Amino acid sequence: GSFAGGWTSSKLIASGKSLDASRKWVIWLGAIFVVPGLGCLYIESPYWAIALISFALFATQFKQAALFTLPIDLFSKKDAASVWGITGSAGSFGAMLFTPVIGWLVDTISYSPVFVIVSFLHILSALMVMLFIPKIQYVGTISTT
């Protein structure tokens, strides 16, 4: 998924799409293609369940390829590492908080709500990119006017 997402973004840029359009297209495509993984909750075949989960994981990594480049796209070389450190720490902290919730959901209900929550968090993250980063562009091209 990561290779395909990076390749797709590069091809879109090479074809004349803006950095903003190519990154957001890859982010949205990945976010949307995670959702069909929910089908694994409704089928009995373990093979199809594995196929759907694999497709959702592929889509996750497809999306991540564009997300991983955002600090490099938006910040100077000097600041990009710090931004990644902060986002990595925030992600680890979020995982730490969410782990007991997952355990509780699985113990009291099932894996179903976990799959639903995780699927729609991808849509939420794409929406947050749209909201908080209206235009993805290289640091050297940011206008201050």
Segments from the language model and where they lie:
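Transmembrane alpha-helices of Major Facilitator/SLC transporters
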Residues: G1-I13, G30
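A late C-terminal transmembrane helix in Major Facilitator Superfamily
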Residues: S2, I72-T108
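Interfacial helix-cap and linker-helix signal at transmembrane-aqueous boundaries
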Residues: T8-S9, I13, I102-S110
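C-terminal transmembrane helical hairpin of 12-TM major facilitator-type secondary transporters
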Residues: D20-L67
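Alpha-helical transmembrane segments of multi-pass secondary-active solute transporters
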Residues: V26, V83, L105, V114-V118
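Multi-pass alpha-helical transporter architecture, strongest
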Residues: V35-I43, V118-T145
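Conserved short cytoplasmic inter-helical helices of the MFS fold
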Residues: Y47, K78-S82, P113
